[in-house]
Amino acid sequence: MRVFNNAFASVMERVGDGEFQVPSAESKFVGTADQEEFVISWLRHICLPDPVHPEAIVSSLYYDTPGLNSYHEKTGGDFIKTKCRLRWYDPDLSADTALRTTYLEIKHKIGQGRRKSRIRVAVDRGWLDTAGLDHPEFHAILARDAPSLGESLPSGLMPAGVVRYRRRRFICPFTLSRICLDSDIGLGRINERLLSRLGPVALGTIVLEVKDGAPAQIPWLSRLYAAGIRQRSFSKYGACIASLLKEA
């Protein structure tokens, strides 16, 4: 177990410390909030806790075009999807209490395959926690740091909204796949120059993600399927914006 923990931690540090491209496969399983207690109990019984970051609150600021092209890619079921986001975590990873560690991420998805590039960006903590999404620094981060990732992006991207959720991480003992259970998914701040605030958005949905592994090779997933959890495509950003726009 010690060898496994050390090896896994090494990979996570490489992903977290700078620019890195991660080609991988990802499958999602979706359920309702009232199934959360069963799912988390089953994961704790059958899986290993993530040895590096077992739990966090994840905040993701999504960039989109004035025509919400990224949102429409997701809701339209496009086979090829691109998303750009600025992500941060609680507890924070920065040793400096005045700063927050964020990651500018560009993620391309083709079917179930995905490639994610990201770079670490340190920002002022107080500013990030309180700034309106029309603040020019959000665009400056994108203009300054995205080119170093060597990725093509749609023109006219601007901050759209912050999706926030609780993430609990596990390792499948059979395949060493990374397993994430996301719950309490909702939309926080929005850019009111792009979207109208029509009320709070809280999805009554849980999402189980299987990363770097084929679901057919994971025997314990059948128990979740029997409980009503279903494999399907799901975008937290897409679902939150659809709920905001009353299109869900």
Which residues make up each language-model segment?
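Phosphate-end processing signature that detects enzymes handling 5′-triphosphorylated RNA
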Residues: 1-248
